[in-house]
């Protein structure tokens, strides 16, 4: 087996793991919403969409046979993570400055108008406010944890691409 094939297999395993982690995070968010009664705000829902897009693109990338297709999917994963950084970063800002609003009047109809909100309203429909403080998990708010996950994804996926695409001389 060539080095390129080994690197590609490693990237595909990483993408599968990333997709599983994103689905687990969405499952955790649904658990907190349904069982613990923590209502999601518009920014929470946008973060769920970002996680879902990361998972979808990661699984598609893992199923690709060529290096170019995997790279395209990894680029889409990174772009989805950047979208998640924007939503989670804004959410962290709002939690730090409670006088600001997440714009529920502006964002709610937009987020509730997205297709998944009608197909799966329990998981993708807005029912809360961004300024609602929930108990921290290991000292960080859920928005801070989401921001950390999106930043890690946005850094590690391109790092994986760069490391595996370098040609040893």
UniProtKB/Swiss-Prot annotation:
Keywords associated with the record: Cell inner membrane, Cell membrane, Chaperone, Disulfide bond, Electron transport, Membrane, Oxidoreductase, Redox-active center, Transmembrane, Transmembrane helix, Transport
Main location: membrane
UniProt xrefs under Pfam families: DsbB
MF terms in GO: electron transfer activity; protein-disulfide reductase activity
Gene Ontology BP terms: protein folding
Paired cysteines (S-S): 41-44, 102-130
InterPro entries documented for this protein: DiS_bond_form_DsbB/BdbC, Disulphide_bond_form_DsbB, DsbB, DsbB-like_sf
Residue stretches spanning the membrane: 15-31, 50-64, 72-89, 145-163
Segments in the Periplasmic topological domain: 32-49, 90-144
Topology versus the membrane: Multi-pass membrane protein
Coiled-coil ranges per UniProt: none
Entry GO CC: plasma membrane
Cytoplasmic side: 1-14, 65-71, 164-169
Subcellular location per the Swiss-Prot or TrEMBL entry: Cell inner membrane
Highest taxon in the source lineage: Bacteria
Known function: Required for disulfide bond formation in some periplasmic proteins. Acts by oxidizing the DsbA protein.
NCBIfam families: PRK02110.1 (NF002552)
Similarity comment: Belongs to the DsbB family.
Protein name: Disulfide bond formation protein B 1
Protein's organism: Pseudomonas savastanoi pv. phaseolicola (strain 1448A / Race 6)
Name of the gene this protein is made from: dsbB1
């Amino acid at each position: 087996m060539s080095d390129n094939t080994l690197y590609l297999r490693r990237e595909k395993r990483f993408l599968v793991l990333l997709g599983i982690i994103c689905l687990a995070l969405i499952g955790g968010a649904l658990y907190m919403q349904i069982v613990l009664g923590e209502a999601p705000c518009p920014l929470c829902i946008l973060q769920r969409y970002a996680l879902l897009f990361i998972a979808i693109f990661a699984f598609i990338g893992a199923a690709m046979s060529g290096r170019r297709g995997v790279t395209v999917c990894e680029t889409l994963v990174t772009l989805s993570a950047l979208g998640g950084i924007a939503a989670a970063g804004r959410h962290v800002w709002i939690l730090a400055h409670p006088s600001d609003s997440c714009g529920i009047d502006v964002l709610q109809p937009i987020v509730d108008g997205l297709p998944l909100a009608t197909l799966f309203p329990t998981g993708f429909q807005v029912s809360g406010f961004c300024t609602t403080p929930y108990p921290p998990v290991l000292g960080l708010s859920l928005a801070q944890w989401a921001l950390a996950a999106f930043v890690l994804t946005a850094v590690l996926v391109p790092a994986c691409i760069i490391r595996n695409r370098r040609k040893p001389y």
